A protein has these predicted regions:
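Class I SAM-dependent transferase core
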Residues: 2-73, 103-104, 110-120
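Conserved beta-strand/loop positions that form the S-adenosyl-L-methionine
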Residues: 75-77
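Conserved SAM-binding loop of SAM-dependent methyltransferases across substrates and taxa
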Residues: 79-92
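Short, conserved acidic/polar surface loops in the N-terminal third of protein domains
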Residues: 85, 109-110
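Conserved SAM-binding motif I beta-strand of class I
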Residues: 94-99
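Conserved small/polar residues in nucleotide/adenosyl-binding loops
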Residues: 124-125
Length: 125
């Protein structure tokens, strides 16, 4: 779905190196997002370029900061940005996703399970 080479090049320009495994997981996340978005309105941005630029690259810029270590709480995460992307890039962080909308929490739980991020918290507030 996403252009992995394009995303990798864009991120490399900012000093962010993505592994093949991270790119595969981001691609899987994009596919889950677009598929689930047909049932539940998660985001208006669903084109591959939009997901790469506005969801993934922006989230990765935050995740690459040294301050994004330890415990990270993503309040009002919506469809999981930047939290899930940060966890894919930085598996060492302890991630808590907080979202008040139940249908989005359902997606977050589903996406985290599918992406192998099950050890982290998804909270309904």
């Amino acid at each position: 779905m996403i252009d992995k080479e394009r995303l990798a090049a864009k991120c490399a320009a900012y000093g962010i190196a993505l592994t093949a495994q991270q790119l595969d997981r981001l691609d899987a996340y994009a596919r889950l997002l677009v598929d689930y978005n047909q049932k539940v309105n998660l985001t208006a941005i669903t084109t591959p370029e939009g997901i790469e630029d506005r969801h993934f690259a922006d989230s990765l810029l935050l995740a690459a900061q040294p301050e994004a270590a330890g415990a990270v709480v993503d309040v009002g995460t919506g469809a999981g940005f930047p939290g899930i992307v940060a966890k894919i890039y930085r598996p060492d962080i302890r991630l808590t996703l907080m979202e008040p909308t139940g249908k989005r929490v359902d997606f977050l739980r589903y996406a985290c399970a599918e992406l192998g991020l099950e050890g982290d918290r998804k909270s309904v507030v």
